[in-house]
Structures are given as structure tokens and as C-alpha cells.
């Protein structure tokens, strides 16, 4: 295969077509091959799905009656020739599905044309930034946006919340994705309106998958006020700070709080000092949102 038909994913797994509650047949073994243009699942039959027909991607959500039959999964919704939507559930090892998910979203979303307004709002202030034409690029860590004036990115770890709004920007028709994210300690709003509704839905699903993963990792972490203060201090200073000064000069207390944050996986130490982990960044973002409300 050449060009867009070169394989970007190739693995052996299992699959089920249109799995539904009440159906408990064993999934079928298959080879899964994907290029930048199409997905092929080759088992007893060969299923070919053009990526331009993919309308939804769901990671890990399996109907209850077949849940015990699968491990790590990804479900792909796609339109058929008669206009109906079918689903294809693919199973593989956890690492394999994680890599496949990342490549799939890149193939589906890279090069997406969109109108963007960035930033549309900083804190409570509406900006006068113009709406620009842009192209999107995707990695598991961020959404990259390229305009005629330059490039910027929205890191997943900076996301506070996002929602679909049913109006367009820059004279275009809706809908639009409104993304609230942290920038320099302030809650910022950016508006992204892909020219294709299908791409907008997939972009929303991508954010839901990646941001949801981080939210689940911090959902059960309980923090006291001293821990929150130190996390914000690390964020604000990049870790270059006398931590005892944050907690009324109590060195022993500061050490205990730092150790607690480290054990909870919210900070890490490297050659350049203390820094936030992705999970720590999410916790700080939520606090920034609370302050800006």
C-alpha cells in the first residue's frame, strides 16, 4: 500500500458487529488493519469501513450482557450505504487498544477545517479577537490549531470543561464547541467550529475520552486546603518557590504536605524541581475555575 493506504495500525484482536444487550455470542477473532482512509476487519468475513463514514468512537463502554466477554475495547459507529448507523466493537490488549485509539482519532481529525475564536473570553472579559480559519491536529495530549497568523494548542491537562453550543461563529452555521481551559492562571474560553458536523461530534468525543480519563484518575482524591494551596503555588511558580512560605513558615508541615501530594500522584520531582503531574494539573484547573466563577 502507498500514501494514504499505508497501514498505520495492524493487530490481531476480536470483534463483534452491532453488539446489543441480550446477545452473548462469543466475539470473533480477526485481523484489524487501518490506513488513513479506511478500516478493515478481516475475520470469517471482511468488513471495510471508510473513515469518512465514521460518526462516533466510544472507548470501553460495552453492553452489560456482553461485558464479561471483552477486555479493552473501542466501539466505532459508522454510516452504511443505506444511511443507517452500525457499530463495530473491537477488542485487544489494553496497550494495543490505547495506541489504536490515539491513531484512530488522529486519522479522523487531523486536517479538520474549522473556524476558531481564541481566546473568546479571558476570566470574565470578552476579547476582541477575530474569528480565524484554521486546521486542527490531534495528539492524545492536545488539540493543535494552525491559522494564517500562527499556531497554538489546547492541552488536555488544561481543559476545565467543554460543551456544544448550537450557534456558529464568524458568519458560519453552528454548532460550535466551547472549551474552557486554564491559561496563565486564568479561566479562558476558546470557540472551535469545525466546518463538518461529523468532525465536531468526533472532536467532542475525543475530548470526552481523553479529559474523562484524567477526571477519573483524580475523582477519588481527597485534598485538604494546605494541599490545594501548595498545588496552586507549584502551578503559579513552576515549582521555584520556598514552600514553607506558603504554609506560614512551618517547614515540617510543608514537607508533610509535599509528601502527601507526591504519594497521591499530583506532583513529581525532576532535575528542574517540583512540577505538577497531568492529574495535578487537572486538580489545579478545577480550582482556577472555582476562583473565576
Question: For each of these PLM feature ranges, what is it?
Answer:
Residues 23-27, 56-86, 161-189:
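Non-transmembrane, membrane-adjacent beta-strand/coil modules in membrane-associated proteins
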Residues 156-219:
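Long, low-complexity, charged/polar intrinsically disordered regions in eukaryotic proteins
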Residues 281-293:
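Short, amphipathic alpha-helical interaction segments positioned at domain boundaries
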Amino acid at each position: 500500500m502507498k500514501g494514504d493506504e499505508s497501514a498505520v495500525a495492524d493487530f490481531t484482536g476480536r470483534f463483534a458487529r452491532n453488539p446489543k444487550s441480550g446477545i452473548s455470542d462469543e466475539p470473533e477473532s480477526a485481523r484489524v488493519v487501518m490506513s488513513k482512509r479506511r478500516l478493515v476487519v478481516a475475520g470469517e468475513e471482511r468488513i471495510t469501513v471508510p473513515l469518512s463514514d465514521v460518526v462516533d468512537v466510544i472507548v470501553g463502554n460495552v453492553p452489560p450482557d456482553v461485558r464479561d466477554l471483552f477486555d479493552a475495547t473501542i466501539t466505532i459507529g459508522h454510516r452504511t450505504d443505506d444511511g443507517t448507523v452500525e457499530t463495530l466493537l473491537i477488542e485487544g490488549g489494553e496497550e494495543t487498544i490505547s495506541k489504536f485509539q490515539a491513531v484512530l482519532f488522529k486519522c479522523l481529525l487531523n486536517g479538520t477545517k474549522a473556524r476558531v475564536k481564541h481566546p473568546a473570553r479571558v476570566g470574565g472579559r470578552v476579547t476582541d479577537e477575530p474569528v480565524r480559519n484554521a486546521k486542527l491536529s490531534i495528539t492524545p495530549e492536545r488539540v493543535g490549531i494552525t491559522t494564517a497568523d500562527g499556531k497554538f494548542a489546547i492541552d488536555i491537562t488544561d481543559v476545565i470543561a467543554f460543551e456544544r453550543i448550537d450557534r456558529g461563529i464568524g458568519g458560519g452555521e453552528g454548532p460550535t464547541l466551547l472549551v474552557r481551559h486554564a491559561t496563565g492562571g486564568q479561566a479562558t474560553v476558546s470557540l472551535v467550529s469545525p466546518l463538518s458536523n461529523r468532525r465536531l461530534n468526533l472532536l467532542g468525543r475525543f475530548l470526552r475520552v481523553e479529559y474523562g480519563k484524567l477526571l477519573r484518575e483524580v475523582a477519588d482524591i481527597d485534598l485538604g486546603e494546605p494541599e490545594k494551596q501548595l498545588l496552586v503555588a507549584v502551578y503559579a511558580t513552576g515549582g521555584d518557590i520556598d514552600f514553607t512560605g506558603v504554609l506560614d513558615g512551618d517547614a515540617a508541615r510543608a514537607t508533610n504536605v509535599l509528601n502527601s501530594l507526591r504519594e497521591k500522584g499530583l506532583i513529581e520531582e525532576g532535575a528542574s524541581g517540583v512540577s505538577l503531574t497531568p492529574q495535578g494539573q487537572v486538580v489545579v484547573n478545577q480550582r482556577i475555575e472555582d476562583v473565576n466563577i
